[in-house]
Structure formats: C-alpha cells, structure tokens
C-alpha cells in the first residue's frame, strides 16, 4: 500500500506510534501531491490493485479538503483505486464521503489509551461507520481483560458485528510486539475475530 498521512489528531493516546509525524508536516496542493504520486509510479500500481491508505492522526479533521482531493483524484486517474480511510471514530463522516465507496479502517480507542471515555466513545458515529459495506474495527489490546470492554461497549449494544473486529497488540518496540502478540492472537482465536500484527515494528523496530 501507499500511505498519505494527514497532520493533526483529536486524541493523544499513550501508545500512539505516529505522534512525531502528525504533530509536524508540510502543506501540499493537489498538483504537488499528483507529482509525488507520478514520480513514485503509483498510478499503474493503483490500476493493478495496490491500496492507497489515507491516515493520520485524524483524516476526518480535514474532511472538506479530503473530499475535494478524492473527487479530483478520481477524475485525474480515470480509475477507482482501492482507497482506505483510517480514523479514530470521533468525527462523523459526511454522506458525500460515505458514498465514495471507500474502505473504512476504524480504530476505536479503549480505556487502555488513557483517552477520556466522553471523547473516545461515540456510539452514533461508530454505528454509522459499522453500517458502511467495507468497514472494519481495529482495537489495540494490552491485556486479555480489554476484550470485556469490547464486548460490553461494542458488541452487546450491537454497534458493530463480530466479523468486523480486528485485534492488534499494543507495542512500540519489536520486543513488546513479540511479547504481546501470542496473548492477543490467542484472544482473537478464542473470540472468533481477526488478528493483525504491526509489521513495520516487527521488521524495522521503529514506530514510523
């Protein structure tokens, strides 16, 4: 996949692995972004199925600009590449954005993030995101008891479906990832949900 990381976030999670990036950044116009896409030879790769992931921070903080960028990108490319929007489930996406047939990579925060519940838990937004066809929910797990929070706050109220859930180990180093992965994988197997590692940390022992 190719990543476009947008600056800014609504939260400050204690385990965030990208803080250094979304606190800083550069301003690019559409032509400059297209120039980077062309120089990276991504147009052909998009046509062949490579994903284009728009992440943050919180991409929906720039929702009007994001919509404008995507509309112009589709016209320029003359194809509909697989585009993922990563978000933290605290900002409601507009109907215009939802109707663009994107993939939604949602990351609701649990209490282990140290983000106050009133900020991180937005049932109306979560239910709306769950209703989108290609939408899934990735939870960072630090201990087995975190599953109870998912069960009580997301599954029992029927905000999301079990098949939409992905569990990911909390880890900022390779050592942490290796230590926590078996516990999270076992939890995923037991609960019948998906497991995801953090390949960049496993390969390079770096957060970003």
Predicted feature descriptions by range:
Residues 1-103:
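Conserved Radical SAM active-site core
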Residues 60-208:
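Conserved AdoMet/S-adenosylmethionine-binding subsite of the radical SAM
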């Amino acid at each position: 996949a190719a990543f476009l990381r947008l600056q800014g976030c609504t939260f400050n999670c204690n385990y965030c692995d990208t803080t250094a990036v979304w606190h800083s950044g550069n301003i690019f116009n559409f032509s400059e972004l297209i120039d980077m896409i062309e120089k990276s030879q991504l147009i052909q790769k998009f046509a062949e199925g490579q994903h284009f992931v728009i992440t943050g921070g919180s991409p929906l903080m720039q929702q009007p600009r994001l919509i404008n960028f995507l509309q112009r990108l589709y016209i320029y490319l003359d194809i509909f590449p697989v585009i993922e929007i990563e978000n933290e489930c605290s900002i409601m996406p507009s109907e215009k954005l939802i109707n663009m047939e994107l993939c939604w990579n949602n990351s609701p925060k649990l209490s282990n993030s140290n983000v106050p519940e009133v900020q991180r838990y937005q049932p109306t937004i979560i239910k709306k995101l769950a209703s989108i066809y290609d939408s899934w929910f990735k939870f960072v797990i630090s201990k087995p008891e975190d599953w109870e929070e998912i069960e009580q706050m997301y599954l029992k109220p029927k905000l999301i479906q079990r098949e939409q859930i992905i569990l990911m180990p909390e880890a900022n180093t390779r050592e942490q990832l290796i230590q926590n992965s078996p516990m999270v994988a076992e939890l995923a197997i037991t609960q019948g949900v998906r497991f995801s590692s953090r390949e960049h940390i496993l390969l390079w022992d770096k957060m970003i």
